[in-house]
Amino acid sequence: MPGVANPGPSKSRRETADSSSRKKVHFSSIHDAVRAGDVKQLSDIVERGANLNEVDALHQFTPLHWAAHSGSLECLHWLLWSGADATQTTTRGWTAAHIAAIRGQDACLQALIINGANLATQDDRGCTPLHLAATHGHSFSLQIMLRSGVDPSVTDKREWKPVHYASFHGRLGCLQLLVKWGCGIEDVDYNGNLPVHLAAMEGHLHCLKFLLSRMNSATQALKAFNDNGENVLDLAQRFLKQNVVEFIQGAQYEGSHPDDHDDLAFPGHVAAFKGDLEVLKKLIGDGVINLNERDDNGSTPMHKAAGQGHIDCLQWLIEMGAESNITNKAGETPSDVAKRFAHLAAVKLLEGLQKYEIDDIESDKDHINFFTRHGVEGSTDAKDDLCLSESDKANARMRAHKKIVELRQLLEIAESNFKHLGGITEEDLKQKKEQLESKKTINELQGQLAYERLRREKLECQLDEYRVEVDQLKETLQKIQVTSVAAMEDDSCESSKEKRRVKKKVSPGGVFVRSYQRIRTSISSQV
């Protein structure tokens, strides 16, 4: 495939493109105009009769294929608006989505998905765009496709799934993303190879460690044989992968370094966090992770380096073309993270990349900063091959905004025409539905209110009856209390009289008896 290994234009080429003295080139073919990202000449060539789906003689690419290949996002938008066929394939069975996945053009891939591109289309080897993104280590492109609902466990003609491709090519970022989305790491291919077999035979130690840490039994995985009777150690020895051989023989997988488990998933982020520039360079240079790799929190290595104030790591990432406007799940850019941790040198370095001040942005399209770059521009997995100046990019944003205004006006006209013809719009239907629901709610509340009023009146009547009954009971109680008091007083008077009578009778008799006994006793003693 043309240009797959091309990492993008160099810094000097971009500086040349930004110079105001750049000469205007006139293109003779629609494919050249698309590769250069010149949407004006593309439009002119099509107006002169060029076919939107014209195939070039050398590579059998359509203009849409070339737009996805070079990252000509505006041209790709224009072609899709104009009706270009997104299902047309090359001689190898690649659609524009396949090429965007290979090149890591995630912005182009998003545009294709929005326009209905079929991500389940397989090429001549049975590979979908998902397989190709995993092969080339474009984890953000992979994530975009997974979020669109594509099957993460689709197989090619060799029964390889995306997880097999990521393991074989040592794409740790893609591998961990696929595992997170539920891809089976214990599935075998047509030769009985597990992903750990493929990682071992290619010497991808980071991927091997990660796979073993996520498998149900690492010991069983190392002992598992493929259809040729080879286990992980056999394959590593046959292909002379000494690092894997030493790892297995040293039994490091059995938990001798439990503190390193976080490093298995995001070693690049850990290196950036620690300021280990050499490890970071090696990981990115070897393709284990890409420059703008996201972790579970959406942070890139630049976020990690900015949070710790590692200026050397930040400078290297910037020189390599890392995107400084990516936001994590908290909505923070690397500059925001540096501010939060008060690393002023990092803040100054990162804010120097911005060509505008946030406070100066206005919603007025006539403002000078309205069409300047305000966020992530284009793809983040891989840089495009275009050499566009800042004015060209601003003009592209102006054209896109103009398209928005035109379509809004057309939509208003179309809605007005529809209403004039007796139709009803979705907005009107929604309003009527809301009105009906409001009316229904009001009626229900009014009925509830009437019921509560009747209930209140009934309760008030019962309350009046209870009050009358209480008054009657109070009167009866008072009468009973008065009668009982009078009776008690009469009883007390009678009892006191009876006591006095008994006292008078008993006292004299008792004295007489005692006197008689004393006299009798004295007579007896004398005798």
Curated annotation (Swiss-Prot):
List each coiled-coil range.
395-484
Query: Pfam family of this protein, just one?
Result: Ank_2
This entry's Gene Ontology molecular function terms read: NF-kappaB binding
Question: Which ranges are annotated Basic and acidic residues under compositional bias?
Answer: 12-21
What are the recorded Gene Ontology BP terms?
positive regulation of cytokine production involved in inflammatory response
Q: Which UniProt keywords apply?
A: ANK repeat, Coiled coil, Repeat
- Spans of ANK repeats, please give: 25-54, 59-88, 92-121, 125-154, 158-187, 191-220, 228-257, 263-293, 297-326, 330-360
One cellular-component annotation, GO? nucleus
Region called Disordered, residue ranges? 1-27
Q: Entry's InterPro entries?
A: Ank_Repeat/CDKN_Inhibitor, Ankyrin_rpt, Ankyrin_rpt-contain_sf
Q: Which PANTHER family does UniProt cross-reference here?
A: ANK_REP_REGION DOMAIN-CONTAINING PROTEIN, ANKYRIN REPEAT DOMAIN-CONTAINING PROTEIN 66
Put simply, this protein is called Ankyrin repeat domain-containing protein 42
Gene source species? Mus musculus (Mouse)
